[in-house]
Amino acid sequence: MRADGATVTFIGTGRGSGAGLVAAAGIDDDVVPMRGLERRLAPKNLIAVALAAAAVPRAMAILRRRRADVVIGGGGYVAGPVALAAWLMRIPVLLTEADSHLGMANRLAAPIARRVALAFPIAGRTGDKYVVTGRPIGPEVRAATRAAGRAALGIADDAMCVLVVGGSQGARTINRAVAQAFGDGPSFELIHLAGAGQLDDVRALLADRAPGARYHLYGYLDNFHDAVAAADLVVSRAGGSVFELAAIGRPAILVPYPHATADHQTKNAQWLVDAGAAVLVPDTECTAERIATLVAELLAEPARRDAMALAARTVARPDAAQAIAAAALQLATA
């Protein structure tokens, strides 16, 4: 949007990882004190409701000062009061939904939005208001290549490589299965992103084993796109990373987090499974034996992996960010 001459600012709580990302992008931000509702009756929810009510006039003042022409809501709990403030000021609202169901903030704000950009088709959410754009990915993901990824991670061009991803906080089931399956030394290059919160646990699992030089264990990598691009096969949860797997075009074994809201990770995984780009393994079936067998089967079948990679790229929407930006600019100038 900035490339098209628009001024972009951000409204948030000033807390969490998002604040750092906004500052790093050189985007001006405004703070609205907020807290999320707990999914049970709790006294803290009274505070959350009071903050939400106070956030509406505060957001109106910010939008007036910023002279906003359009508001884009990202689905977080700040988005609800800001969307309401925009609606009261007759500023068009565009909501974005990153999962396979509408989150609470988007469900509440959808009736007053002009457009809702969906990552996936959602039953009952049809008509001109709803448009399926996919989930935005960064330019570094769109530009990722196998050669660059392997150079960045020191993986030989002719080596087989498997990437294991548990998510930013790690996935105990995946980590345990992979450490048990390949702890005595994989026959391929294994990049294991255990998650910062699980790294010590995985190290303990490997302490009495001999993983060898081909087992590359990390908490996380800032250049995650390089790890995906370097891999011949990915074992992962099925959160937002499924869009990066699709954009880069990597076959995957997906183990959805079983306690995700509305079971959206299973729905995310099923999107790639239905396309022929992934194999789904329920969390309860994610054992060392199951993972070892699937990895061996897929590494032994290059034609199958190629077909899965092509299927992933076919359903990918690498231009999601551009589509959302175009929709927002259209609303701003209508």
Go through each PLM region and give its residues.
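Glycosyltransferases and closely related glycan-assembly transferases
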Residues: 58-71, 79-94, 107-112
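C-terminal alpha-helical cap of glycosyltransferases
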Residues: 317-334
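Active-site-proximal region of nucleotide-activated glycan assembly enzymes
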Residues: 7, 17, 28, 87-147, ...
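Conserved nucleotide-sugar phosphate-binding/catalytic loop shared by glycosyltransferases and other
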Residues: 2-54, 133, 196-198, 284
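Donor-nucleotide binding loops and adjacent catalytic segments primarily
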Residues: 16, 21, 25, 146-151, ...
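A short, well-ordered alpha-helix in the C-terminal region of glycosyltransferases
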Residues: 304-318
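Conserved donor-binding/catalytic loop of nucleotide-activated donor transferases
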Residues: 89, 229-231, 246-255, 275
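Acidic donor-binding loop of glycosyltransferase active sites
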Residues: 68-70, 218-221, 229-243, 250
